[in-house]
Amino acid sequence: MAGDKPMSPFWSPSRHLDRRPFLQARGAVTGALRGFFAEQGFVEVETSVLQVSPGNETHLHAPRTEIMRPDGSRASRYLRTSPEFACKKLLAAGETRIFEFARVFRDRERGELHLPEFTMLEWYRAGAPYDAIMADCVVVIARAAQATGIGTFSFRGRTADPFAEPELLTVAGAFEHFAGIDLLSTISGGEGNRAALAAAAVGKVRVAEDDTWSDIFSKVLVEHVEPQLGQGRLTILFEYPSPEAALARVKTDDPRIAERFEVYACGVELANGFGELTDAEEQRKRFMESMAEKQRRYGEAYPLDEDFLAAVAAMPEASGVALGFDRLVMLASGAIRIDQVVWTPPADER
């Protein structure tokens, strides 16, 4: 607002003093989680920030840069949106349990829960089903709360007990319960029927003429489902529909469902995990479809990382998860904005 006093820079001693307890909590959580992974026999890895492809999801946007080779020629590179591609290459190399506190980057993201640069905690277990990674998430979140001494997470008037047994809820069950939509009836042969979901969503969300099945799904999820999740305790939302599989494998006994889950606390998404897809040709097909949609919507598309696709074909069966570390620290420390828990928040913070 005009006339509002500008916020002091983060290095202002008075502002830093206010933020310091949250930053100390960040250190405590980091140490506690490294201890958990050490107990479990994980190896901590550090993978490259600069990538040939930052990821191939339609709605994720990555900062782009150039590198100059010794001969003066230039090559495009991207700041990664996730360490996933690099970590899976390490699984193909023979690593079996790895984790990384990864600095990642996303354009077009800023707010109470979003930063353009943030920390993603990712870990992978070779030879493990995805419910093993779900169980890891529950322990990791409890360890974070234990490290700071907080008994209850709180955000925007919602609370969650990080030590309670989590709620397990299928995506189809959530759509039926919170939106009155029979989601699986709108999927056939692994493909979403746009007309069927649009009809089911009438009166529940606004559907635009150019909305895809995935767009309508996301609107219902955001407006009707997510606000109800993680209330009183954690919610694990699992069995995502196959059109939203991303890098997850589809269930062998039901092609409408993918081995994908998300974890919520206080309505906040904390983690997104997969039973990992190891079919390189299927992964290529999904990437190409996503990039075609990205080109249509945003006028840009990212290249495919052919080295990654080769590694997918060589990967063992595995499961993995990406957890928003800054969000976890925010809840575990009692902070109300994500910038309170990062040491050097963006200079444009207001």
Region spans (language model):
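Class II aminoacyl-tRNA synthetase-like tRNA-binding/catalytic domains
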Residues: 2-132, 140-142, 226, 330
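Conserved structured core elements
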Residues: 23-27, 31, 39, 43-44, ...
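A generic structural signal for well-ordered coil/turn residues at beta-strand boundaries
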Residues: 59, 75, 95, 114-120, ...
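Metal-assisted phosphate- and nucleotidyl-transfer catalytic regions
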Residues: 143-268, 289-315
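Active-site pocket scaffolds in enzymes
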Residues: 280-350
